[in-house]
Amino acid sequence: MPRRREVAKRVILPDPKFNDRVVAKLVSVIMLDGKKSTAERALYGALDIVSQKAGEEPVKVLKKCLDNIKPMLGVKSRRVGGSTYQVPVEVRADRRVSLAMRWLVRYANERSEKTITDKLAGEILDAYNNRGAAVKKREDTHRMAEANRAFAHYRW
């Protein structure tokens, strides 16, 4: 947290194939060891599979899938006296998107399909249909926030 001035947000350039910033950001989340072309190949392959199976525009399906994963509420630890409370807080808009992308990639990697392309396509389609591990993670996060609603007055 800088003391002097607000740090400017970096502008992410849209990806070359779909000309979309969300796809470009997801490529960055998928990327390991700076291998961007490998990450692009995996995501573009997954989006091709998604467009075949869903019969819709792949970017539209991806955005709907991310909307289904985005958490509205979360919990933050807050120490009061000698005990730590899980205080429910609303998640900021930019954090919602980044959490959704991280969860999508994380739970896609845990799937049993053989290639990362198939794993990503499967998780995207599951999230699009409100199923899958990433959507379950969002539901668990919301349930945790709801369970700790009694501590909402500790919000800061």
From Swiss-Prot:
**SUPFAM superfamilies from the UniProt entry:** Ribosomal protein S7
**GO cellular component annotations of the record:** cytosolic small ribosomal subunit; ribosome
Q: Name one GO biological process term.
A: translation
Cite the entry's keywords alphabetically.
Answer: Ribonucleoprotein, Ribosomal protein, RNA-binding, rRNA-binding, tRNA-binding
GO MF terms, alphabetically ordered: mRNA binding; rRNA binding; structural constituent of ribosome; tRNA binding
Residues annotated as signal peptide: none
Q: Name one Pfam family in it.
A: Ribosomal_S7
Function statement:
One of the primary rRNA binding proteins, it binds directly to 16S rRNA where it nucleates assembly of the head domain of the 30S subunit. Is located at the subunit interface close to the decoding center, probably blocks exit of the E-site tRNA.
Note the subunit structure: Part of the 30S ribosomal subunit. Contacts proteins S9 and S11.
* PANTHER family per the UniProt record, alphabetical: RIBOSOMAL PROTEIN S7 (PTHR11205)
Q: Give the record's family classification.
A: Belongs to the universal ribosomal protein uS7 family.
The molecule here is called: Small ribosomal subunit protein uS7
Q: Which organism is it from?
A: Geobacter sulfurreducens (strain ATCC 51573 / DSM 12127 / PCA)
